Amino acid sequence: MKYIFVTGGVVSSLGKGVASASLGALLRARGYKVTAVKIDPYINIDAGTMRPYEHGECFVTASGAETDLDIGNYERFLDLDIPAGSNITTGQVYQEVIRKERAGDYLSQTVQVIPHVTDEIKRRIRAAGESAGAEIVLIEVGGTVGDIESLPFLEAIRQFRFDEGDDNVLYLHLTLVPYLGTSNEFKTKPTQHSVAALRSYGISPDIVMVRSKDKLPAEITRKIAAFTSVRENRVFSSYDVEHVYQVPLALEEQGLGKAVEELLGLEGTHPRLGVWTDAVRTIKHPKQQVTIAIAGKYTAMPDAYLSLMESLTHAGIANDARVNIKWVNAEQLAEAGAGELEGQFADVDGILVPGGFGIRGIEGKVKAAEYARTHGVPYLGICLGMQIAVIEYARHVAGIEDANSAEFDEYAKNKVIDLMPEQLEVAGMGGTMRLGDWPMELRAGTKIAELYGVPQGGTVKERHRHRYEVNPAYVEQLEAAGLTISGVTPGVEGRGAGLVETVEIADHPFFVALQAHPEFKSRPMRPSPPFAGFVKAALEHQQQ
């Protein structure tokens, strides 16, 4: 296997994930088997218990791992399911080292950062590549060079070149070149200092990639090359573009794929990037556009809904449309009257209620679902958004006026949403939900079955992340009131026909909700069926 390590300097949030994923896309387009690893130096075991406002969304893999959002970027850009073990944290590493010490695996040894912690880091990186059957492993080291948390990881990746040989290891360093408008110039000093800091840890970058507002002039590229001792044709400009899916094409135009092949001793191949070119063309020059309202509580931090936004983009590509997002703060909707609701939703073509946890903003989300139902506006509910749809329908159609969820009121009389029985004895928070791929058996003749291309009914898999479910005791009453239970996970103890996975309203233009998170499986060239159908319905609604 060959290894490409991506580090960052100057400031955080430069876009190492997008840069790494874009390079992976270029290598995949050349026919190489590629996988990706994200290293997060925090002490948490995973991203499952972090605040979305601080860390962005928690991306769930097929195996049920709760990971950093960059794993989602890798899956979308590489069009692959990233295997378990590909998000490495300090917490995981130290937990395993301490477990081994207690088990006697290091008997008679003094357990230290070097070699025990660094060896565990290297073992995990190699294992991730082997489990994916990869020829090339991309490893993004989170944080910024100089962070104290990153030191063991930098030492471990330094050792890789000694262990694996020069032709099998490549170091790419991403930095920032700010532009000062007052003096009308790009400033390279931060990049020079960042590369010097990286070298102080024994790592000399083979490639320097520079984030900047605009493409760097040739003289700035030459200056960076001279001061960092990196060849000029190995200094690349990662400048701002209209959409992230332009990044692979922009980097390929500069020769990044070819440079990587040369440095790793790979035979030069011609990339097949036609699908990327077509997708970018549609994104930049769509034939039509729609506006979708997302009624959530993390609207001030769009990264909390990153996969949702990308799924809407993918659905837009499939429908040759630009999808404009209108963020609606669900907390503010809670006290809104009819006039205010009309003001929020009159100009939108669809309403989406995303997943989430906790009571904050819930009544506002219920009002959003009610507006969509009563005004014939296309509605897509995701995870909590499905539970909201059920609560709203129970209250206003099925006559269960005090319907609620046990999550919001554990003493509610009519808990149409309840804690799953399997969760009753669960004590811990981390990694204990119903996670990862689960089968959904779709009923023949339903909208959801049509969307997934199985109109006669069939089983599909989607990813999940939840503790609560539709209470099976209310299914018969809800169905009698006209709510269609269109998909279930069969064979779940105590659930009768099955655990409710999807609901819809038959006489509504498009009212579909899923317990699953289909956004986690959506790809630029393979959009999620519910999202593609939702955007199509929004376009049709727009024409009315």
Curated annotation (Swiss-Prot):
Annotated EC: 6.3.4.2
Catalytic reaction annotation: UTP + L-glutamine + ATP + H2O = CTP + L-glutamate + ADP + phosphate + 2 H(+); L-glutamine + H2O = L-glutamate + NH4(+); UTP + NH4(+) + ATP = CTP + ADP + phosphate + 2 H(+)
Glutamine amidotransferase type-1 domain: residues covered: 291-544
GO BP field: 'de novo' CTP biosynthetic process; CTP biosynthetic process; pyrimidine nucleobase biosynthetic process
Activity control summary: Allosterically activated by GTP, when glutamine is the substrate; GTP has no effect on the reaction when ammonia is the substrate. The allosteric effector GTP functions by stabilizing the protein conformation that binds the tetrahedral intermediate(s) formed during glutamine hydrolysis. Inhibited by the product CTP, via allosteric rather than competitive inhibition.
Residues that coordinate or bind L-glutamine: 53, 356, 384-387, 407, 467
Location of the region described as Amidoligase domain in the Swiss-Prot/TrEMBL record: 1-266
Molecular function GO labels: ATP binding; CTP synthase activity; glutaminase activity; identical protein binding; metal ion binding
Gene3D superfamilies named in the record: 3.40.50.880, P-loop containing nucleotide triphosphate hydrolases
Binding site for CTP: 12, 147-149, 187-192, 223
Cellular component annotations (GO), alphabetically ordered: cytosol
SUPFAM superfamilies tied to this protein: Class I glutamine amidotransferase-like, P-loop containing nucleoside triphosphate hydrolases
Residues binding UTP: 12, 187-192, 223
Pathway: Pyrimidine metabolism; CTP biosynthesis via de novo pathway; CTP from UDP: step 2/2
UniProt xrefs under InterPro entries: Class_I_gatase-like (IPR029062), CTP_synthase (IPR004468), CTP_synthase_N (IPR017456), GATASE (IPR017926), GATase1_CTP_Synthase (IPR033828), P-loop_NTPase (IPR027417)
One matching Pfam family: CTP_synth_N
Keywords per UniProt: ATP-binding, Glutamine amidotransferase, Ligase, Magnesium, Metal-binding, Nucleotide-binding, Pyrimidine biosynthesis
List of catalytic residues: 383 (nucleophile), 517, 519
Residue numbers binding ATP: 13-18, 70
Keyword Phosphoprotein: no
Protein purpose: Catalyzes the ATP-dependent amination of UTP to CTP with either L-glutamine or ammonia as the source of nitrogen. Regulates intracellular CTP levels through interactions with the four ribonucleotide triphosphates.
NCBIfam families: PRK05380.1, PyrG
Additional detail: CTPSs have evolved a hybrid strategy for distinguishing between UTP and CTP. The overlapping regions of the product feedback inhibitory and substrate sites recognize a common feature in both compounds, the triphosphate moiety. To differentiate isosteric substrate and product pyrimidine rings, an additional pocket far from the expected kinase/ligase catalytic site, specifically recognizes the cytosine and ribose portions of the product inhibitor.
Family statement drawn from the similarity comment of this UniProt entry: Belongs to the CTP synthase family.
Protein name: CTP synthase
